[in-house]
């Protein structure tokens, strides 16, 4: 089961399924993974013998006035033919190609981790956007409740005004607050439409798809909570950290590869075939030819090229280590921030809910006193403002629970598990 299934929201599951299928960002990550797989195949090729076949046939005429004495030169045009198999195998004494394969394998695994990171970024971004949509719908409900309360207060003031118990100024002030509540409701409706467009873009779809997104569940099930033990091992599962570590391993292998360039290359070379003067003699005995033996080459003077390539490999490795450390520090901060906010939210929500209960009771009492002529309209409006602000605060904090849960999941890597290392990566 994927982490987002724990929210038990069928619409969210459907949206993520669409995003994973159609997102251009994931298509880019998959293309990069395919490229890394191809490079790994290329890197492993030099460890195997390279065999090729050649065949040629044609006619030739030799000069009578060149290096060969005229009396021994064949006359006229003559048919010639040759077929051969050749083999070249560079013995990897110094581990040059094993290091290259190890580097390519680490880069392939890093690409796999980067693809997982792309999935994590997409799914958490989509779920966070969905959480924002849920918050906006909750605020819309709060705004509708505010319109209803403001309307009731305005009606109450107007009734008392009609009986000569209230001033026109108080009625108009209540009407203004009702209009303000309606304006807020319209603004939230606009924000909901804009948020739907953002979600549609994450799906790789147009605005028409966004209009089909309904209201999220009123209270998505949040079960992940804080892990019992937040260890570095758990943090090390983050795909971006895994990718950075694997890139560092790859660049370390590149250093070994460049160091091997300073040592002799030892090749086993062999070829065998048949050649003849005249096609009809190609298969006759005596047409065979061949050779076999080692070939050794040693770089003597390269103008500093090998030293420069080694220094560049070492500098690239140092850079990758710094990038890994930066990624790790950023991850630690993200986890710490998410945990701090989640822990703080519990107390904030508890106090906000207590404040809402008190504000509702105060508004009810003041409204009753106002009807009995024991309170003025200003007290009613102040109590009403306090109650509505408390309601908005509680709504915001309840909606924030889902967002913080998503942020913690992203900070911890979304349950990513690196695949076992391929044995070809071992030197």
Annotate each predicted stretch with a short phrase:
Residues 1-39, 137, 219-249, 299-300, ...:
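Bacterial Sec-pathway N-terminal export signals of envelope proteins
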Residues 363-402:
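C-terminal structured "cap/appendage" subdomains that terminate the fold
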Residues 97, 113-230, 341, 345, ...:
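Periplasmic alpha-helical coiled-coil/stalk elements that build and connect Gram-negative outer-membrane
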Residues 5, 20, 76, 103, ...:
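Amphipathic alpha-helical coiled-coil scaffold segments and their short linker/junction regions
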Residues 207-209, 220-222, 339, 393-427:
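Acidic, low-complexity, intrinsically disordered peripheral segments
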Residues 27-28, 44, 91-119, 169, ...:
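Sec/SRP-type N-terminal targeting helices
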Residues 1-7, 17, 57-86, 209-227, ...:
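Small/polar, glycine/serine/threonine/aspartate-rich low-complexity segments that form flexible
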């Amino acid at each position: 089961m994927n982490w987002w299934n724990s929210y038990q929201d069928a619409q969210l599951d459907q949206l993520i399924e669409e995003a994973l299928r159609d997102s251009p960002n994931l298509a880019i990550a998959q293309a990069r993974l395919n490229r890394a797989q191809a490079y790994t195949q290329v890197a492993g090729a030099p460890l195997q013998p390279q065999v090729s076949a050649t065949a040629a046939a044609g006619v030739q005429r030799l000069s009578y006035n060149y290096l060969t004495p005229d009396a021994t030169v064949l006359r006229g045009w003559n048919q010639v033919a040759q077929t051969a198999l050749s083999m070249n195998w560079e013995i990897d004494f110094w581990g040059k190609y094993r290091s290259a394969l190890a580097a390519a394998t680490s880069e392939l695994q890093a690409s796999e981790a980067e693809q997982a990171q792309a999935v994590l970024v997409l799914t958490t971004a989509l779920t966070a956007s969905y959480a924002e949509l849920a918050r906006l719908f909750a605020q819309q409900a709060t705004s509708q409740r505010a319109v209803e309360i403001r309307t009731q207060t305005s009606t109450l003031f107007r009734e008392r005004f009609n009986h000569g118990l209230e001033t026109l100024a108080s009625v108009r002030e209540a009407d203004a607050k009702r209009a303000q509540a309606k304006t807020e409701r319209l603004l939230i409706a606009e924000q909901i439409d804009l948020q739907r467009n953002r979600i549609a873009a994450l799906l790789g779809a147009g605005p028409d798809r966004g209009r089909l997104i309904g209201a999220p569940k009123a209270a998505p099930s949040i079960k992940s909570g804080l892990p019992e033990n937040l260890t570095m091992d758990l943090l090390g599962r983050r795909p971006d950290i895994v990718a950075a570590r694997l890139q560092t391993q790859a660049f370390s292998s590149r250093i070994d590869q460049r160091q091997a360039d300073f040592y002799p290359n030892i090749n086993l070379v062999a070829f065998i075939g048949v050649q003849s003067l005249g096609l009809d003699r190609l298969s006759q005995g005596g047409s065979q030819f061949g050779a076999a033996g080692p070939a050794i080459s040693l770089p003597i003077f390269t103008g500093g090229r090998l030293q420069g390539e080694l220094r560049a490999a070492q500098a690239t490795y140092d850079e990758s280590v710094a990038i890994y450390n930066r990624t790790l520090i950023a991850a630690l901060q993200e986890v710490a921030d998410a945990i701090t906010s989640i822990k703080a939210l519990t107390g904030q929500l508890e106090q906000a809910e207590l404040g809402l209960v008190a504000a509702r009771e105060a508004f009810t009492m003041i409204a009753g006193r106002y009807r009995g002529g024991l309170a003025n309209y200003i007290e009613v409006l102040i109590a009403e403002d306090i109650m509505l602000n408390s309601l908005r605060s509680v709504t915001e904090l309840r909606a924030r629970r889902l967002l913080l849960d998503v942020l913690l999941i992203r900070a911890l890597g979304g349950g990513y598990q690196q695949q076992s290392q391929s044995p070809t990566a071992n030197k």
